[in-house]
Amino acid sequence: MIKFSNVSKAYHGATQPALQGLNFHLPVGSMTYLVGHSGAGKSTLLKLIMGMEKANAGQIWFNGHDITRLSKYEIPFLRRQIGMVHQDYRLLTDRTVVENVALPLIIAGMHPKDANTRAMASLDRVGLRNKAHYLPPQISGGEQQRVDIARAIVHKPQLLLADEPTGNLDDELSLGIFNLFEEFNRLGMTVLIATHDINLIQQKPKPCLVLEQGYLRY
């Protein structure tokens, strides 16, 4: 599914690389934690997989294709195979929950009626069909995070990435979010979760990639 071969990334003006010489492989159907303190390089690694950043060295393979060589016209096709869950939700506050979830499909060219049907099915999977016509400010933080997850999976991605998805939630809500990720993984989705929530990792043990100052330690 995903393979990093000696991947490095440095930002202009930075005193040290964000990522240095990374080598790892995530097989199809795996669920893995990406662990590290703030600034360790977790978000940068996820952005490289999404094609939002370019590596300075090395190769990143996704389903047998080197994504470091993709053109700007090919990147959108890559992103349709990947879902991304954010810590800060990034929901449009003037659009209803179902409109937020359907929007990526409409942007990709799907008819709004079909996109709405798919969005409702995605909300079903996260238990929020009953909040479909609410605005994001009218629902709780935990529910907004579930909306972001519904949006991330609405296009049925092969790979789901999550960047600190429980950073703003209490332990009980965090556990519920991780249960959703486990459910998607059981259904065949490959999942990579960037987190520093050690307590939750201990409750839900999975293979870990540990980043420290841009280096992969384990």
From Swiss-Prot:
Membrane topology: Peripheral membrane protein
Binding site for ATP: 36-43
Annotated Gene Ontology cellular component terms: plasma membrane
Keywords: ATP-binding, Cell cycle, Cell division, Cell inner membrane, Cell membrane, Membrane, Nucleotide-binding
Location of the protein in the cell: Cell inner membrane
Principal subcellular localisation of the protein: membrane
GO MF entries: ATP binding; ATP hydrolysis activity; transmembrane transporter activity
Domain ABC transporter, first and last residues per copy: 2-218
Short name of any one Pfam family annotated for the protein: ABC_tran
GO biological process: cell division; transmembrane transport
Subunit structure: Homodimer. Forms a membrane-associated complex with FtsX.
Entry function: Part of the ABC transporter FtsEX involved in cellular division. Important for assembly or stability of the septal ring.
NCBIfam families per record: FtsE
Family recorded in the similarity comment: Belongs to the ABC transporter superfamily.
The name this protein goes by in its record: Cell division ATP-binding protein FtsE
Organism: Haemophilus influenzae (strain ATCC 51907 / DSM 11121 / KW20 / Rd)
